[in-house]
């Protein structure tokens, strides 16, 4: 049996009872170690808590070495641990499909992730649209496909959750080209860098999917004892020191409910200004009034 087990957001004890029971009966335990990190628990602490040795699974192992993970999983129990929820990344879906192709039984044990815990900032989950990811820009790679999804969300009034990039055990392009197994130090994108990249692409595109004055909320260390939120415009948050990782950002949609706004105001430095920014943004993205068709517009 292959168990995909969600660990939750922060602490070793965030795992469910069912998940812990599954780990204890597994002969091998892998911890996915590149899409996110457990903020308040080290590998050693997890091993002590589970009573099991943990094998760190980097991107290379999961995406190209899945045979190692699935080896003998049809005869013994293997656990694949994921920070958050098991289906928080497409890579994990691919692992399940590979297991099923090899007739290996799979059991999923869910847990909290940023996708549902984001409601802690006060925004209602059913007012969210498509989630996007913001990667670190390089000198010659500045992808902006996420821009269109933000634009689509904003047009229909929905909030956009922006997941910020992390780099764990990644190689530079030069080292990859030379075949050198030298890895870069871990990096975690800050709120300020995310907002700077948002503004750069808006200036490049010029469609005004958002502006420097668009309201947003910064989310830091969600699910930990030091979690924090900061409401402000994108330009204001581009100068915000968000502290230790991990971070996410929500760009507000046009349909910001009054209860959502009341909650967000608690995280704003200037409550009056933020309230005006939200009102101005709602007016800016206000849809045109519906005009009934005239007889000339009909097909008759």
From Swiss-Prot:
Phosphoserine PTM positions: 172, 298
Family to which this protein belongs: Belongs to the diphthine synthase family.
Main function: S-adenosyl-L-methionine-dependent methyltransferase that catalyzes four methylations of the modified target histidine residue in translation elongation factor 2 (EF-2), to form an intermediate called diphthine methyl ester. The four successive methylation reactions represent the second step of diphthamide biosynthesis.
Gene Ontology CC: one annotated term: cytoplasm
Protein name in UniProt: Diphthine methyl ester synthase
Pathway involvement of the protein, from the record: Protein modification; peptidyl-diphthamide biosynthesis
Gene Ontology biological process: methylation; protein histidyl modification to diphthamide
Recorded coiled-coil stretches: none
Assigned EC number: 2.1.1.314
Pfam families per record: TP_methylase
Subcellular location: Cytoplasm
Chemical reaction(s) catalysed: 2-[(3S)-amino-3-carboxypropyl]-L-histidyl-[translation elongation factor 2] + 4 S-adenosyl-L-methionine = diphthine methyl ester-[translation elongation factor 2] + 4 S-adenosyl-L-homocysteine + 3 H(+)
PANTHER family hit by this protein: DIPHTHINE METHYL ESTER SYNTHASE, DIPHTHINE SYNTHASE
Entry binding sites for S-adenosyl-L-methionine: 9, 85, 88, 113-114, 164, 222, 247
The protein's enzyme class: transferase
Family matches, as InterPro entries: 4pyrrol_Mease, 4pyrrol_Methylase_sf, 4pyrrole_Mease_sub1, 4pyrrole_Mease_sub2, Dphthn_synthase
Originating organism: Saccharomyces cerevisiae (strain ATCC 204508 / S288c) (Baker's yeast)
